[in-house]
Amino acid sequence: MSFAGLLDFARKDVDLPQNSPNELLKDLHANFINQYEKNKNSYHYIMAEHLRVSGIYWCVNAMDLSKQLERMSTEEIVNYVLGCRNTDGGYGPAPGHDSHLLHTLCAVQTLIIFNSIEKADADTISEYVKGLQQEDGSFCGDLSGEVDTRFTLCSLATCHLLGRLSTLNIDSAVRFLMRCYNTDGGFGTRPGSESHSGQIYCCVGALAIAGRLDEIDRDRTAEWLAFRQCDSGGLNGRPEKLPDVCYSWWVLASLAILGRLNFIDSDAMKKFIYACQDDETGGFADRPGDCADPFHTVFGIAALSLFGDDTLESVDPIFCMTKRCLGDKQVEMYY
């Protein structure tokens, strides 16, 4: 790590380069994603097999948000995703890999984006998800038994998108989520765990799907999220951590679900997001000057969509998909 990097780590923030981009380089990012999809012999592509379906969702969603989905290889991608389906009803990250809730949701989202969800078996998928709900209302991500509030959102989102939400024990799921609600207004991975921006997104998203946002103090949760903004304008995941462009999405989307987007400095936030763009290769990095990747690219673009960038499709804050492709699957939220 450079001396400047050590200083950034010590003060838990970064400086934005003076020559940072001051607008969204949308076409450059679309080229970055398109090349990433086509360059299947690259080291980074090969080493990402363990999360391939999630990576496909990130790339496809970034292109859909950028109004350039037609550049993607629809038939090839849909067939690959369908090839990740297992006999238990779930989807793995790649063909031959075990099923997991994270990849099952990403598979469903990708098929919806390509208007191919009818090729999936909604009943077997929802039964797979139902089988991972525990007696206390929580969900395991797979048969390994790991419990995490991320998996509650994955479960409710998957079944909602398939029109099978009633398959799950929603009351029990909500009770578990509320056991993870901390006095500071945040949520952790499990009861008693530290509050984290990503977990807040998962929990408020799940509560919104369940129609139970009234269970929490929205202002208190929004205030915890607002304090994640650093002097650079970026957002971090929890106190004393560096800002990261992916939290632009987790925090902003949570605030949007809560109806509290005005709790942060949007102009400063946009400057940070713009500064995380690679103006040579395209794509977004976690922080200015780092290497771009599809994960940070989709969430950087999605965050800018939440701010109303009219060059982008409008994004749904719960599902991180375009409102256009969701149609009547969007969740009504009342404030």
Curated annotation (Swiss-Prot):
Coiled-coil positions:
none
* Gene Ontology biological process terms from the UniProt entry: endoplasmic reticulum to Golgi vesicle-mediated transport; PERK-mediated unfolded protein response; protein geranylgeranylation
Q: Which cofactors does this protein require? A: Zn(2+)
Keyword field contains S-adenosyl-L-methionine:
no
User: What UniProt keywords apply to this chain's record, in alphabetical order?
Assistant: Metal-binding, Prenyltransferase, Repeat, Transferase, Zinc
Q: Which reaction does it catalyse?
A: geranylgeranyl diphosphate + L-cysteinyl-[protein] = S-geranylgeranyl-L-cysteinyl-[protein] + diphosphate
Quote the cellular component terms of the Gene Ontology held in the record.
Answer: Rab-protein geranylgeranyltransferase complex
Q: Which residues does the record give as Zn(2+) binding sites?
A: D244, C246, H296
**CDD domains in the cross-refs:** GGTase-II
Please give the superkingdom of this protein's source: Eukaryota
Co-factor binding details: Binds 1 zinc ion per subunit.
Q: Which EC class, in a word?
A: transferase
Query: What's one Pfam family the UniProt record gives for this protein?
Result: Prenyltrans
Subunit comment: Heterodimer of an alpha and a beta subunit.
Q: Relate the protein's function as given in its record.
A: Catalyzes the transfer of a geranyl-geranyl moiety from geranyl-geranyl pyrophosphate to both cysteines in Rab proteins with an -XXCC, -XCXC and -CCXX C-terminal.
- Record protein name field: Probable geranylgeranyl transferase type-2 subunit beta
- What phylogenetic lineage does the species belong to? Eukaryota, Metazoa, Ecdysozoa, Nematoda, Chromadorea
